[in-house]
């Protein structure tokens, strides 16, 4: 696919995540906690985390998976197990670093003290050695990259033989579907706002094609509570990276009109306020 100049301007950049990082952490903790717990369970079921050599949180964001890992499995982890978070957005790794500092201040023996944050592209994990990881978690990552096969290949390269990769991918969610109103204002953004949804079969196929075995994929439904339509839409427009990137090309009048359209769309999807927005995440795992 050829990306036109105005579409390129609408793609999120690493710096777009800076303002979003803290709010994303709060939202994501609610949105993806069930899939995160399922992802960690997949890792532990296939290869007990009590014997982990290295655990990589690939595309870590602010460290939600790592935080859940340490909270749930921290006492079981071997003392020499290397813990690493990587993300292409420096603002997200800043959040990881803040979480580590806070955790160690509260408990000097916390496994957080061993967490290293690195700014890396998931398509080029050059500072992660071959066969150095026993477990890799890639939450809501691989199918959102420009080259999903390369992302999975890099995961496989860094995994030890017998190591486990657990991934997740959106089947769909209401709040991103709301963006279908954007082309009513800017028709040229129709391609840019198309979401990258997946299915159980697609995730299974991707993992098997990448060479992973004993692949299993499950569907996890989720709900995100909101207090009012206006607050949810304003948060979406102010902090969601894809939205922030698109709004660079909007005039103030266009932003006002977009807010109105988003409010109307949200009321169709979920008329009551407060209410719940719905979505579903695929969680899959495979062994190298």
UniProtKB/Swiss-Prot annotation:
Its EC number is 2.1.1.-. One of its GO terms (biological process) is methylation. Pathway: Mycotoxin biosynthesis. S-adenosyl-L-methionine binds at residues 87, 121-122. SUPFAM superfamilies: S-adenosyl-L-methionine-dependent methyltransferases. InterPro entries: Methyltransf_11, SAM-dependent_MTases_sf. Keywords: Methyltransferase, Transferase. Gene3D superfamilies: Vaccinia Virus protein VP39. One of its GO terms (molecular function) is S-adenosylmethionine-dependent methyltransferase activity. It is an enzyme of class 2 (transferase). Methyltransferase; part of the gene cluster that mediates the biosynthesis of UCS1025A, a member of the pyrrolizidinone family that acts as a strong telomerase inhibitor and displays potent antibacterial and antitumor properties. These compounds share a hemiaminal-containing pyrrolizidinone core fused with a gamma-lactone, giving a furopyrrolizidine that is connected to a decalin fragment. The polyketide synthase module (PKS) of the PKS-NRPS ucsA is responsible for the synthesis of the polyketide backbone via the condensation of an acetyl-CoA starter unit with 6 malonyl-CoA units. Belongs to the class I-like SAM-binding methyltransferase superfamily. This is Methyltransferase ucsB. It comes from Acremonium sp. The lineage of its organism: Eukaryota, Fungi, Dikarya, Ascomycota, Pezizomycotina. The gene is ucsB.
């Amino acid at each position: 696919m050829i990306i036109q100049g105005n579409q390129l301007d609408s793609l999120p950049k690493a710096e777009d995540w800076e303002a979003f990082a803290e709010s994303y952490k709060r939202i994501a903790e609610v949105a993806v906690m069930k899939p995160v717990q399922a992802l960690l369970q997949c890792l532990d079921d296939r290869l007990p985390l009590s014997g982990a050599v290295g655990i990589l949180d690939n595309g870590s964001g602010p460290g939600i998976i790592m935080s859940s890992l340490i909270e749930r499995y921290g006492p079981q982890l071997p003392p020499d197990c290397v813990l690493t978070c990587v993300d292409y957005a420096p603002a997200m790794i800043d959040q990881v670093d803040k979480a580590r500092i806070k955790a160690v201040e509260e408990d000097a023996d916390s496994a957080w003290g061993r967490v290293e944050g690195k700014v890396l592209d998931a398509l080029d994990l050059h500072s992660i050695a071959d066969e150095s990881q026993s477990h890799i978690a890639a939450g809501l990552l691989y199918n959102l990259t420009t080259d999903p096969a390369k992302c999975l290949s890099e995961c496989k390269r860094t995994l030890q033989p017998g190591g486990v990769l657990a991934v997740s991918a959106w089947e769909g969610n209401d709040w991103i579907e709301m963006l279908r109103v954007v082309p009513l204002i800017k028709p040229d953004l129709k391609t840019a706002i198309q979401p990258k949804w997946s299915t159980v079969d697609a995730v299974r196929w991707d993992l098997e094609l990448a060479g992973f075995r004993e692949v299993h994929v499950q569907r996890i439904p989720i709900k995100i509570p909101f207090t009012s339509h206006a607050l949810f839409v304003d948060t979406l427009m102010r902090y969601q990276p894809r939205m922030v990137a698109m709004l660079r090309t909007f005039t103030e009048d266009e932003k006002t009109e977009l807010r109105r359209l988003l409010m109307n769309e949200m009321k169709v999807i979920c008329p009551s306020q407060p209410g719940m927005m719905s979505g579903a995440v695929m969680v899959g795992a495979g062994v190298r």
